[in-house]
């Protein structure tokens, strides 16, 4: 394969991995430790 194809595949895999990790952090088990500052704010 050409170098450009390998770089494109690598960047695509990296982007998909980062998106998956962000979704897991937002909605998976680690999200239980996250707090919403807007819920804690008293008007």
Curated annotation (Swiss-Prot):
InterPro entries: PSII_PsbN (IPR003398). GO terms for biological process: photosynthesis. The chain crosses the membrane at residues 5-27. It is a single-pass membrane protein. Keywords: Chloroplast, Membrane, Plastid, Thylakoid, Transmembrane, Transmembrane helix. The keyword ATP-binding does not apply. Pfam families: PsbN. This is Protein PsbN. GO terms for cellular component: chloroplast thylakoid membrane. HAMAP family: PSII_PsbN. It is found in: Plastid, Chloroplast thylakoid membrane. May play a role in photosystem I and II biogenesis. The lineage of its organism: Eukaryota, Viridiplantae, Streptophyta, Embryophyta, Tracheophyta. The keyword Nucleotide-binding does not apply. Belongs to the PsbN family.
